[in-house]
Amino acid sequence: MGNIFDILGPVMVGPSSSHTAGAARIGLIARQLFGRQPERAKVYLHGSFAATGKGHGTDKALIAGLLGMLPDDMRIPQSFEIAKEEGMDFVIENKDIKGAHPNTAQIIMEAEGVPAMKIQAHSIGGGRIKVCKLDGIDVNFSGESYTMIIRNVDEPGRILSLIHI
């Protein structure tokens, strides 16, 4: 059974909780996983994100999230201009991603001195999201609770060195 927040949408800049608020959250979680604002981003829109993305502000919301904006940030409609002012280059294209949820975005982020990162996530409605791929590895988390992600080389002592036991 759900709760009242499954019925009421999030406080957000509209028009769509899935295509705008969800997209902003995808961009924001991508930035958080990357650890900083990317200098360059390639954003791919799939399915209904691609079909109605411009009309619902999906493209601007994703860039806003990469800039660190929350879904209720009134600057979302100006995110393209803000990105240019802050020196973040970006490209947004439509892409057919086989087997992906209709509201899927794929983001490749790059910055000097940091390994590139590729994230794939989708908006499930009400401003909620699921991250389904991280650097080509299947994952499943929403960002609604703390999640620890460890990249591990499978060799003796590696995990022990991470957890300091």
Language-model regions, residue ranges each:
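A structural-propensity feature for long, helix-poor, extended segments
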Residues: 46-85
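Non-transmembrane, aqueous-exposed alpha-helical and coiled segments at domain scale
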Residues: 31-42, 70, 76-77, 102
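C-terminal edge-of-domain segments
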Residues: 84, 89-119
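Conserved phosphate/anionic-ligand binding catalytic regions in large, soluble enzymes, centered on
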Residues: 9-27
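Conserved small/polar residues in nucleotide/adenosyl-binding loops
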Residues: 163-165
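Short glycine-/aliphatic-rich beta-strand segments at the starts of folded cytosolic domains
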Residues: 139-152
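Short, hydrophobic/aliphatic alpha-helical segments
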Residues: 1-11, 41-44
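Short, conserved charged micro-motifs
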Residues: 116, 156-161
